[in-house]
């Protein structure tokens, strides 16, 4: 099953066709990352494009790595796996960063995950910016795009 509210669009474009051709020739080289769903089945955390391409290539089975993670960690993992991709629209980044920010804030309540006795405590926005190519200021600006009226978000 796809990730609920997945902010990254899976496009049937030239890049997708190249991925389909590669999968037909070589198979899926990187496993999808999934997690068990309470109602049964699995939810894709990372690999939506590979999954779609595998379907287009006619595969009925694909290898996965199963991770038992909570909602917040699943969001963080999903954003981290996708944010470095090329051809991500500003709105995709905006939605992804906003989702990651909320997940990081939730984890901030769990001191076992965020307390560091030796170093300074990072803000949630600093944690979102860590490990991505955008600065903390850029991350905040992207997140503000979510406040645009829906018609402007589509442009």
Residue ranges and their predicted role:
Residues 59-60, 68, 103, 145:
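A short linear boundary/processing microfeature
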Residues 1-67, 73-87:
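Short, charged/polar connector segments at secondary-structure boundaries
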């Amino acid at each position: 099953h796809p990730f609920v509210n997945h902010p990254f669009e899976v496009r049937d474009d030239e890049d997708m066709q190249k991925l389909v051709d590669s999968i037909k020739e070589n198979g899926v080289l990187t496993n999808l990352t999934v997690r068990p769903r309470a109602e049964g089945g699995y939810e894709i955390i990372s690999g939506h494009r590979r999954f779609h391409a595998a379907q287009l290539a006619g595969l009925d089975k694909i290898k996965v790595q199963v991770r038992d993670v909570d909602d917040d960690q699943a969001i963080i993992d999903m954003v981290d796996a996708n944010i470095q991709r090329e051809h991500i629209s500003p709105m995709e980044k905006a939605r992804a960063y906003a989702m990651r920010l909320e997940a990081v804030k939730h984890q901030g309540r769990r001191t076992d995950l965020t307390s560091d006795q030796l170093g300074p405590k990072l803000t949630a926005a600093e944690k979102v910016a860590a490990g991505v190519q955008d600065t903390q200021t850029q991350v905040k600006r992207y997140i503000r795009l979510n406040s645009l009226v829906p018609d402007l978000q589509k442009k």
